[in-house]
């Protein structure tokens, strides 16, 4: 079973939006051929908290929209197939303040921006990145493909 543990430190995220994000990430999981028995967390924070996280764990003293911590990132390939435990993908942390600003700037809903950022963070958990131009093209292309197939567009 695909499990997402949601935590809202801001009180701004409506319960219905959890369902949309869960459905989107379930769709993305299938598109990326991730096994059903996987789990991750999504936490919603304000600017102050995400800046503190960014400073502490990434040595960047600035606000950002989303941060992901992949649990498998630095782990060697370990075969868990014989064990009855879920694959833990990691943690996604979304700044609701920045999400609202970006939604206003792009002319779409706060709800759509939360979905976009959740998917962006999810792809990071799977190993996608945008450090080089080629990686950016691959990641953003995949992101757009999944969003369009799911039906979460900027309109």
UniProtKB/Swiss-Prot annotation:
It is an enzyme of class 3 (hydrolase). It is found in: Cytoplasm. Keywords: Cytoplasm, Endonuclease, Hydrolase, Metal-binding, Nuclease, Ribosome biogenesis, rRNA processing, Zinc. One of its GO terms (biological process) is rRNA processing. Binds 1 zinc ion. GO terms for cellular component: cytoplasm. Pfam families: YbeY. It comes from the Bacteria. Its EC number is 3.1.-.-. Its cofactor is Zn(2+). One of its GO terms (molecular function) is zinc ion binding. Zn(2+) binds at residues 120, 124, 130. Single strand-specific metallo-endoribonuclease involved in late-stage 70S ribosome quality control and in maturation of the 3' terminus of the 16S rRNA. Belongs to the endoribonuclease YbeY family. NCBIfam families: rRNA maturation RNase YbeY. This is Endoribonuclease YbeY.
